[in-house]
Amino acid sequence: GVVCWAKAGIGAVATQAMALIEHGPLGIELLEDGAQPQEAMKRRLSLDKSPEIRQVAMIDYKSRISTHTGSDTIPESGHFVGDGFSCQANMMWKSTVWGCMADAFVGSEGDLSSRMLAALFAAEAEQGDIRGKQSARLLVVDSDIQQYPWEGTIVDIRVDDNREPLEELDRLLKMHNEYANINSLDEKSISQTKHTGNPEIAFWKSIGLVQSGQISEARELALIAFEENSGWEELLLRCAKNGLAGVTDDTIRALLHTKQDD
């Protein structure tokens, strides 16, 4: 990616508008070394031969922010800095875009990724980019430093080429959230899996439901997977044979009974 850079427990950088990619990773390095966003921004722009055409935003783990929109960025361009967030845009049809993004972010509910997506939809509703639509990304990391570099990424979803990138991003975020709650066996989660019909989630949930004694619900979800691809039935048998994922002979009897009844 070019625009989005983030590291758990450190902060995030967005570099765009004739983007100079190095502002992203090197900006993160400065934040990690202890520089506050304002100082990190100043140091990065001092090394940029054309800061007037760039747009860069930095935020650290304490929600301190610095945002720069160069004087020669392609209009309409600008930014809005709020309480713990920044919205920035360039090459927009309207100068109202970043304000609308901020309103949507503040006015929406849900987790951070959902609110960020709401801001993106608000930008598009305000006519968005003069070039049209193609790509989008959501990147969210933990505010706490993690032990290992591969930990701490909460959401990282990219749509590189799509006629409706925000709708696709929304679809993928919902799928991501469903996977994140794959072990949840409450009524709401089960109902959602029935609605979306994702065979993998249905398969693994069905195993958990058998283990919790919810056999009827387990069979209903298992059928979603079995009807999608016979390989899920084979996987169930192989898991039992190898003693994996808590699958036992009782699990097989409970779930394959679904097909025997048919």
Predicted region positions:
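TPR/TPR-like alpha-solenoid helical repeat scaffolds
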Residues: 232-259
